[in-house]
Amino acid sequence: MPASMFSIDNILAARPRCKDSVLPVAPSAAAPVVFPALHGDSLYGASGGASSDYGAFYPRPVAPGGAGLPAAVSGSRLGYNNYFYGQLHVQAAPVGPACCGAVPPLGAQQCSCVPAPSGYEGPGSVLVSPVPHQMLPYMNVGTLSRTELQLLNQLHCRRKRRHRTIFTDEQLEALENLFQETKYPDVGTREQLARKVHLREEKVEVWFKNRRAKWRRQKRSSSEESENAEKWNKTSSSKASPEKREEEGKSDLDSDS
């Protein structure tokens, strides 16, 4: 590489000027700030470890001048492994580029995958999802706003995705044979079949519930098809009856003649 690239003029020219990169001051009442992920204990400038994973259950003050945060920051943060939920109360601070030592305050920033809540009023906050259910008993709900409580409720009430059990051909055959014998087997019969096909009794019970629902649907559809066929036969016979009457009348006239 040429030595001219490391000259003093080139190094100074690459630095941004403060006059050219002044940013507007953000309002004090900022919208929620949503970050996609926070790892370890970066908000407090502490090293990650086993103690940081579980010690973050309890609210602690944010250290001034933390990693990437302005000095005028106060509040608390709650965390569990890589999941965090808490509040940061940010005051408006002088804004400027990194070369002047000033850090822009947390404003109306938002991740593109999370919509901004409308009508939000209050201090700047940090909301990172999802929130594990183990954290809920340790959270200070009184400090959360109405919008944050609604989002937290949605995350907490979200149903977990169930894993679908894949049955082998032998298991399906044994289950189907028992279903043909009885649609509602008792607990002892289910346990006996579960030991035979190497399944849990809960799985056998769920399979029978689903199989009965399928059987009802098939029975309902077959009855509807039979009813539709009967209606079609009645309508077709009613349409053909006048023609038959005309043919019978003609045959009677021919016999009289």
Curated annotation (Swiss-Prot):
Compartments where located: Nucleus
Biased composition (Basic and acidic residues): 241-257
Gene Ontology biological process terms in this record: middle ear morphogenesis; neural crest cell fate specification
Main location class: nucleus
InterPro entries listed in its UniProt record: Goosecoid-like_HB, HD, Homeobox_CS, Homeodomain-like_sf
Domain of life: Eukaryota
GO cellular component terms listed in the entry, alphabetical order: nucleus
Role of this protein: Regulates chordin (CHRD). May play a role in spatial programing within discrete embryonic fields or lineage compartments during organogenesis. In concert with NKX3-2, plays a role in defining the structural components of the middle ear; required for the development of the entire tympanic ring. Probably involved in the regulatory networks that define neural crest cell fate specification and determine mesoderm cell lineages in mammals.
Family of the protein in this entry: Belongs to the paired homeobox family. Bicoid subfamily.
CDD domains recorded: homeodomain
Gene3D superfamilies to which the protein is assigned, alphabetical: Homeodomain-like
DNA-binding region coordinates: 160-219
Protein name according to UniProt: Homeobox protein goosecoid
Chain positions covered by the region annotation Disordered: 213-257
The keyword DNA-binding belongs to this UniProt entry's keyword annotation: yes
Molecular functions (GO terms): DNA-binding transcription factor activity, RNA polymerase II-specific; RNA polymerase II cis-regulatory region sequence-specific DNA binding
Swiss-Prot/TrEMBL keywords: Developmental protein, DNA-binding, Homeobox, Nucleus
